[in-house]
């Protein structure tokens, strides 16, 4: 299917969403990228995310040459160290590009399995607030993943603080003494969280 949505959270950023409906061979032909990934789904996500990056770069007037990773494994664009964030949960590949500052983005499927791990990422206040809500637990997990990607360094998920939402889809958060506003959208039983 390709790009299903592109939008700009700010004048200096863009998010592109690719829905994978192509075969692996079709994605290889489209992306023209060579990889040694052995898992077919992971390779499909890889190619789709690169195509979503190309789309986002085009929207921001940036030449896409490829990506590299810093010493912590955080990706950035080769040609100008523009900040990027990449996430995928089959059949979606989602990318965010920001020209001026670090950005974070994540996508997760709404799935009851998240309740089995909630004690690993929710602090006591968050756990009390969420209770047994699969959707709310997924929202908090996705937000914390997005914030983790901003830092680019290991941080305990329980130390990422999510204040209650300021609106239906906006959350004020704190990580390592820095405040962030996170937007949350729902797409086909998936949650997407991204920095504002």
Ranges and model annotations:
Residues 1-196:
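Core catalytic alpha/beta fold that binds nucleotide/phospho-ligands
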């Amino acid at each position: 299917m390709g790009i299903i949505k592109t939008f700009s959270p700010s004048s200096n950023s863009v998010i592109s969403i690719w829905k994978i409906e192509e075969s692996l061979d079709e994605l290889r032909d489209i992306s023209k990228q060579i990889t040694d990934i052995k898992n077919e789904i992971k390779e499909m996500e890889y190619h789709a995310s690169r195509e979503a990056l190309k789309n986002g770069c085009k929207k921001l007037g940036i030449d896409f040459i490829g990506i590299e990773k810093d010493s912590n494994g955080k990706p950035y664009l080769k040609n100008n160290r523009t900040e990027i964030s990449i996430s995928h949960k089959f059949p979606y590949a989602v990318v965010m590009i920001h020209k001026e500052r670090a950005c974070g983005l994540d996508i997760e499927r709404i799935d009851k399995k998240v309740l089995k791990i909630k004690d690993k990422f929710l602090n006591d206040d968050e756990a009390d607030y969420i209770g047994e809500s699969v959707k709310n637990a997924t929202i908090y997990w996705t937000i914390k993943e997005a914030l983790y990607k901003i830092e680019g360094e290991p941080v305990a998920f329980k130390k990422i603080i999510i204040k209650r939402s300021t609106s239906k889809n906006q959350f004020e958060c704190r990580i390592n003494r820095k405040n962030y506003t996170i937007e949350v959208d729902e797409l086909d039983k998936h949650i997407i969280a991204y920095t504002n």
